[in-house]
Amino acid sequence: MADIGIVGENEYVEKGQEAKLIKRLGFSKCRLSLAIPKDEEYKGAEWFEGKTIATSYPAILRSFLEERGVKADIHVISGSVEIAPGIGLADAIFDIVSSGSTLVSNQLREVEVVLPCEALLIANNNLSKEKLEILDELLFRFEAIQVAEGKKYVLLNAPKEKLDEIIEVLPGMKSPTITPLANDEWVSVQSVIAEKHFWETVSYTHLRAHETEADL
């Protein structure tokens, strides 16, 4: 048995969660959904009453149906679940959906999202002290990458007289780093900002510096 592993949440939930969930990793996001023929009218989970549903995830599907009080036949198949309605094996499917293009190509439409999924870091419940220390180090590295995701490192030179204005829009993760330059009237500013605000922030700081230069 492995000490640690990265698995899809769909597999982790379906197989009974024997390993310990350590961390959600935030990538390979998808969902386990119910889909029916695109021309069928759908008003709720009762549509599945008495129907046959093809899936590779019977445990998760069974739990969902029981919660909704729906009785349906579960037809377990491995792979190519999406073709089951088209060849008469099932009335609907319960499968992994990402973009939804596979459903469209098989004349199906998504009607119920049962379980949003992503990659999970899991571990054996009986790790030794030494292995737990290694796991902690690995977690530190994973978390560093996750924190850095969607961030930009910005390095710019700015006039001292505009520094307070620039810091207002360039705060950094805690505080920007300010370094003196050979020209006493200017400083170097280093910061980390959200990528989605990168251009508006850079444009603002550039404008402030440009206005100052024009006044010199």
Label every PLM stretch briefly:
Residues A2-Y12, F94-S101, K160:
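Beta->alpha turn/N-cap motifs
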Residues V13-R24, S101-P116:
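Ligand-binding "clamshell"
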Residues T205, A209-T212:
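Conserved small/polar residues in nucleotide/adenosyl-binding loops
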